[in-house]
């Protein structure tokens, strides 16, 4: 009865009392050795892990005790409930960070105006930093006396980006003279540079990836798309609607095709924003997951953990390089699609 009382005491209070008569001293020493070899920054998590692991082993100890002392299996329903409670407590204690935490918008300077809530957030901060960086870069390179006869690295970078976007505009937008094309060039150049620097800035540790938020990319794509539509109406008037009905379409199919083309046209803006948002968010999440996994294994004082971490570590390095390429590619894809849509609005293709 004394041992049964001790078991009940443990079950009620979720203490280690029952283990005193079950677990040998050598096992306790092994646990202590495991803790001694744990880095200080991981000690809290390690304690939680040991508690969780030993709590799950409770069913084995309880069943063995019941079979040896009472001749019947342990209370299955209680053990299942206890497991659920242990797992719930473990998840709360561990506070396992989500790979999506890096995309959280945090208010830095909260502001209230009436019933409206405004705030200066980390997203606003990094957008301003991005704009400030490339505007200052262009200013110092293009100001009077700023350009060098033999260009330095920064001037070469600006000239390279300028020529790249200019050639893109000339190649993709047809039906206009060179001077008229120049009207659209500044907007397209600023859009490309903004997206490029936002994407690349998101690769810096502890920064914020502005283009990983759907509302930001959607606002950018819709505002540009509305501008493209206005250009189409300014150039063609109501005849702009003729692009909804391709030439030579049979009359019975006309209503269906007009509706289909209208939906397709409106979804251009949606797909433009979703493509950028999805690629940036998915890539950064994958890098976060694998880097966290590799770092955890590297922190374990075990040669097998260390060797096992080398694979994920190399994958993280490869994915980081891939993400740099994706950051540049997505800015290019967004820009070239703007040029294509603008060409369609001008030439009714």
From Swiss-Prot:
Residues 1-97 form a propeptide. Belongs to the ATPase A chain family. Keywords: ATP synthesis, CF(0), Hydrogen ion transport, Ion transport, Membrane, Mitochondrion, Mitochondrion inner membrane, Transmembrane, Transmembrane helix, Transport. GO terms for cellular component: mitochondrial inner membrane; proton-transporting ATP synthase complex. Pfam families: ATP-synt_A. The atp6 gene is located on the border of one of the mitochondrial DNA repeats resulting in two identical copies of the mature protein with different propeptide extensions. F-type ATPases have 2 components, CF(1) - the catalytic core - and CF(0) - the membrane proton channel. CF(1) has five subunits: alpha(3), beta(3), gamma(1), delta(1), epsilon(1). CF(0) has three main subunits: a, b and c. Gene3D superfamilies: ATP synthase, F0 complex, subunit A. Its main location: mitochondrion. It is a multi-pass membrane protein. NCBIfam families: ATP_synt_6_or_A, PRK05815.2-4. Mitochondrial membrane ATP synthase (F(1)F(0) ATP synthase or Complex V) produces ATP from ADP in the presence of a proton gradient across the membrane which is generated by electron transport complexes of the respiratory chain. F-type ATPases consist of two structural domains, F(1) - containing the extramembraneous catalytic core and F(0) - containing the membrane proton channel, linked together by a central stalk and a peripheral stalk. During catalysis, ATP synthesis in the catalytic domain of F(1) is coupled via a rotary mechanism of the central stalk subunits to proton translocation. The chain crosses the membrane at residues 118-138, 184-204, 213-233, 240-260, 280-300, 303-323, 326-346. It comes from the Eukaryota. It comes from Arabidopsis thaliana. InterPro entries: ATP_synth_F0_asu, ATP_synth_F0_asu_AS, ATP_synth_F0_asu_bact/mt, F0_ATP_A_sf. Signal peptide: none annotated. GO terms for molecular function: proton transmembrane transporter activity. GO terms for biological process: proton motive force-driven ATP synthesis. This is ATP synthase subunit a-2. It is found in: Mitochondrion inner membrane.
